[in-house]
Amino acid sequence: MKKPEKITSRTADFAKWYVDVITQADLMNYGPIKGTIYFKPLGYKIWENIVKIVNAYFVKQKIENVYFPLLIPQDFIEKEKKHIEGFAPELLTITKVGDKNLVENIYIRPTSELLFADYFKAEIAKNNILPIKLNQWSQVLRWEKTTNPFLRNTEFLWQEGHTIHASKVEANQFAKKIARFYKYFLENYLAIPVISGQKTEREKFAGAVNTYTVEAMMQNFRALQSATAHFLGQNFAKNFEIFYKNKENKSQIPFQTSWGLSTRLIGAIVMVHSDDNGLIFPPKIAPIQVDILEFFSKKNQEVKIFAKRIAKILKNAKIAYKIDDTDQQIGYKINNSEVHGAPIRIEIGPNEVKNNQICLVRRDNHQKFFFNIDLLKEKCRKILEQIQADLFKKAKIRLLENTVFVNSINEFEQAIKNNKFVIAPFSESPEREQEIQEKTGATARCILPKNSFFALPQAGNSIFSGEKTNKFVLFAKSY
């Protein structure tokens, strides 16, 4: 098989490999402004599949979709200076319209907590019904210093959910529930194993009491924060003077959550699963699950007829497919299919037609299968399930083999130098985290829960102070 010439190998230059894959596989083109991209049809279809799956869960949870303004007024910003401080370097500000200066600045949303707080205040004053559970699919803008397509864009697509509750416990538990769903979604649909936990004080979302995160390992052993859920407490409710009447008709301040995932998951799919030939899609999220390649169909119409037969079977089985009926050479068609990442390709030529036979090739390991067309539906479903399971297993092994426990700062520094995920007993200050980042480039990804799939000891000695602690923190270099 001829290797695509335009894709750099992962070992030679991982960053270049990533860009080569997403461009050659037609996921995106660079936009005219730094940090923006044109989503091409294949790239946007991945997002549509994500939206479809996640929305189905939201419906079950009675979370309703809304759409809120892109623009935030200055007085909202003044109310939440602490929250906005975290976004200040990235905040896009409108100061002028035409040739006229605005009396007050207008801000383009980096996130929508302020708008949802304002909305909740009006709705509760009107109806006094809690909880309210909402979500919006939208775009936000953040003027990032360093950009990377899908992983860190100036403008990106996401879902941001917001809820408001009468009870502190109910709100916090709901944030945790959403974080568990994100873990389930990444592992069961994207075949990406994750480490879940709570962010440290330094790393948590600005304005949150607690932030719950799911962290994934890329093939270059960097961490990617893949989704987060925040328990906001009463922080926004107090500043926006949100009140509800309890059963005793007394005014109480409610509790909020916010949570989201974004198009950076497209980058995660690429970085976790793909190879030097191009994309590899997990079947459950793949825009095209089966690529049907016609060979010599211009000279042999029976090949076209056979391809349509296959397509009909796949359509009835609700398996997404595409037919390549171009007159390109065989090698080109195979390479093109490899680059674009369909989990399965079916190669059809005169011999397959003559023998009423299917030639099926797995994208992930290039294993070939030959069988009668009557077995297509059964075989396809079984092989797609196996690919999904194998991709997850491969990524899980990578995660486990490259995550280490350390008990001293020397062990810590060596492990980070070796590009490992590092779990360490740690009960230090945010300033100490800053020191670690400056010295090693690693950040605290999350505090591991006691029920983590890692066998955590009951306690350990914090790697800096030596004090006894039952807190174990995951550190890694990250995107």
UniProtKB/Swiss-Prot annotation:
Q: Which residues form a coiled coil?
A: none
One Gene Ontology MF term: proline-tRNA ligase activity
Q: Name one GO cellular component term.
A: cytoplasm
> Which InterPro entries does UniProt cross-reference here?
aa-tRNA-synt_IIb, aa-tRNA-synth_II, aa-tRNA-synth_II/BPL/LPL, Anticodon-bd, Anticodon-bd_dom_sf, Pro-tRNA-ligase_IIa, Pro-tRNA-ligase_IIa_arc-type, Pro-tRNA_ligase_II_C
Partners and quaternary state? Homodimer.
Described by its record, this protein's role is as follows: Catalyzes the attachment of proline to tRNA(Pro) in a two-step reaction: proline is first activated by ATP to form Pro-AMP and then transferred to the acceptor end of tRNA(Pro).
Q: What is this protein called?
A: Proline--tRNA ligase
